[in-house]
């Protein structure tokens, strides 16, 4: 099993690489790429950790060598948010980066499962899809927007609010991956009930958690460590699915035939071909239905921005 991380020298990329080095199945290969010249050194640094995962680093303009034979590609390359920026401000820089990297994936590892971490995910996933379509290799079951950070934040905040064991908390998160498009389905959390005020407060905190980190870091970056953990969880789930493990379910932003928008975050079953099955997200409360319906114009506009960028 070969996993490639593109943008591996950044804050998310290094955290993700460390976690993958310690958690990938024995015998796996970890391929790290970045435009920054430090990345071969990051690979050497990681190679001293005693796990049976081979690590190689590739620097420079061309990621082809890093991508050869990759089963999973996780893309975290791009610039991070700073105070005063929202995820859409990142579009002007990150759109071109994602386009160029996905073009290389299409040419080098067209069957790989691709997880897009680079923000704004609502838009960058649409860019990736259009690039893959242009190359004639698009498979909607092999492209994912990684929204796992919204899930782990939801699980953490609910466990804290209700004094639960976080390992027992499961919160599906649907929609997209920015602001109002992030919708945790708190009505579906088992064995716990919330007041209307709690639901409103938790939902807002989950939606604004990225900004909470950006402001707390005071200009020193955005959510890198928690995002690295979230991306590792999702990447390992992709690997487990590829290896034939049953019942591997994660929420992800996918082209899953949603009635709402072309791309929509919802639970999916992962398997040997990427998405084996898109799961219905089930019954929602009136609050959640209203929040879902209110986000759709924003989400559609984000998606259209990505489509237009590639055209």
Curated annotation (Swiss-Prot):
Positions that bind NAD(+): 7-13, 34, 94, 117-119, 227
Entry EC number(s): 1.1.1.37
Any one GO molecular-function label of the UniProt entry: L-malate dehydrogenase (NAD+) activity
Residue numbers annotated as active site: 177
Keyword Kinase assigned: no
CC terms in the record's Gene Ontology section: cytoplasm
Family annotation (CDD domains): MDH_glyoxysomal_mitochondrial
Keyword Metal-binding annotated: no
Residues given in the record as substrate binding sites: 81, 87, 119, 153
Top-level taxon: Bacteria
GO biological process: malate metabolic process; tricarboxylic acid cycle
Quaternary structure and partners: Homodimer.
Name listed for the protein in its UniProt record: Malate dehydrogenase
Record organism: Shewanella halifaxensis (strain HAW-EB4)
Name of encoding gene: mdh
